A protein has these predicted regions:
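Metal-dependent nucleotidyltransferase catalytic core
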Residues: 2-26, 46, 52-115
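Terminal alpha-helical segments
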Residues: 75-80, 95-97, 101-106, 112-289
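Short gly/ser-rich loop at a beta-strand->alpha-helix junction or flexible surface loop bordering the NTP-binding
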Residues: 31-45, 49-52
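Positively charged, low-complexity intrinsically disordered regions
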Residues: 42, 56-57, 278
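Generic secondary-structure microfeatures
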Residues: 37-39, 69, 191, 196
Length: 289
C-alpha cells in the first residue's frame, strides 16, 4: 500500500498528520490509519462554490479515514472514541470552513476477512488507499481467487442487499405519488433504478461502479442482461424524454426549484421501473441458482 502524501499541499499534509495524532491519543488499540477516497486518489475538491438553479451551493471533499483496531469494539464505544478524536482535531479550527473528517472503523480480523473474500469496497481501499499510520504488528491480507460456493454466496448477498434497497426506494416513490409530490417521486424512482441496475452488475461481477448516471449503469447492466434494456427503450421522442427526465432527477429534483414533473410523467415511469424490477429479479435469481 502507498504511504506518501507528498502530492498534497502542505496544509492538507498537516491536517492528515494531526488526524493521526488525534486518533492515537484516544485509541491505544489502533493498528492502522488509512486515507481512502478522493484525497487518496488525488481527485478531491478543495472548495467549489457555484450557483445552480438559482441556489448557491458549495462542495468540499471529506478526508475519508479508515481506522483499523486490534480488537472489535462495540459500536457505541468506538463511535464515542472517534468522536473525541474528531473534536480534538477541530480545536483551534473553524469547523464549518475546514475539511470534514469522516471516520469508518474495522478490526484487523474483519478487514482481512473482507479483503480475502474480495469485498470490493475494501479491496479498493487497499489498492487506492494511503497508509498514514501502521503499528507494524499486523499485515493486510491478499485478495484471493474465490471458489464457486464463495462467489455464489457473495453474489446472493449483494443481490439481496441492493434489490431490497431498490424496492425501498420504489415504495417511497409510491408514497410520494399518492401524496402528489411528483418531483421527489422522480428522485426516488431514479434511486430505485440505480439500485436495480447495480443489483445486476454486482450479481454478475461482484463489483459496483461509483456511478449515478442511469445511462452508464443501464449500459453496464445490459452487458449481463440484454432484457434489462427492455424497461427503458429509447426509440421514440417520448421514450427519450421520460428517460432523460429520470436521469436528470438525481440532481434536479433536489436542487432545481423549477424542475417540473407531472402526474402523467410519474404514471408513465412507474410501470417501466416495475418492469426493470421484475427483469432484475429474474436474471439475478437465475444467475445465483
Amino acid at each position: 500500500m502507498k504511504t506518501s502524501i507528498n502530492y498534497l499541499p502542505e496544509q492538507k499534509r498537516d491536517d492528515l498528520r494531526r488526524i493521526v495524532e488525534c486518533v492515537l491519543e484516544v485509541l491505544p488499540d489502533c493498528e492502522m490509519i488509512i486515507l481512502y477516497g478522493s484525497y487518496a486518489r488525488n481527485t478531491y475538491v478543495d472548495y467549489d462554490q457555484r450557483i445552480e438553479y438559482g441556489i448557491r451551493t458549495c462542495f468540499m471533499s471529506d478526508y475519508d479515514i479508515l481506522v483499523v483496531t486490534s480488537t472489535r469494539f462495540q459500536r457505541y464505544i468506538i463511535n464515542h472514541i472517534l468522536s473525541k478524536a474528531t473534536d480534538n482535531y477541530y480545536k483551534g479550527k473553524n469547523r464549518y470552513a475546514s475539511t470534514t473528517v469522516q471516520f469508518i472503523d474495522e478490526s484487523i480480523d474483519d478487514l482481512n476477512k473482507a479483503i480475502d473474500k474480495n469485498r470490493y469496497f475494501y479491496t479498493d481501499i487497499k489498492r487506492e488507499g494511503i497508509m498514514l499510520y501502521n503499528s507494524g504488528r499486523y499485515k493486510l491480507a491478499r485478495r484471493r481467487k474465490l471458489n464457486y460456493r464463495e462467489i455464489k454466496e457473495l453474489a446472493e448477498e449483494y443481490y439481496n442487499d441492493r434489490f431490497e434497497r431498490a424496492n425501498d426506494f420504489l415504495r417511497n416513490a409510491m408514497y410520494d405519488k399518492n401524496d402528489e409530490r411528483y418531483k421527489i417521486c422522480s428522485f426516488h424512482l431514479h434511486q430505485a433504478c440505480e439500485n436495480y441496475y447495480n443489483s445486476i452488475i454486482l450479481t454478475f461481477t461482484l463489483y459496483s461502479p461509483k456511478e449515478h448516471s442511469l445511462i452508464t449503469l443501464s449500459g453496464r447492466a445490459k452487458t449481463h442482461s440484454l432484457e434489462s434494456s427492455e424497461a427503458f427503450p429509447r426509440d421514440t421522442e417520448e421514450e427519450k424524454r421520460l428517460f432523460d427526465l429520470l436521469q436528470d432527477a438525481y440532481v434536479q429534483a433536489r436542487y432545481n426549484l423549477h424542475f417540473r414533473v407531472t402526474k402523467e410523467d410519474i404514471e408513465a415511469l412507474i410501470p417501466k421501473v416495475e418492469l426493470l424490477r421484475d427483469i432484475t429479479r429474474q436474471c439475478c435469481e437465475e444467475r445465483i441458482k
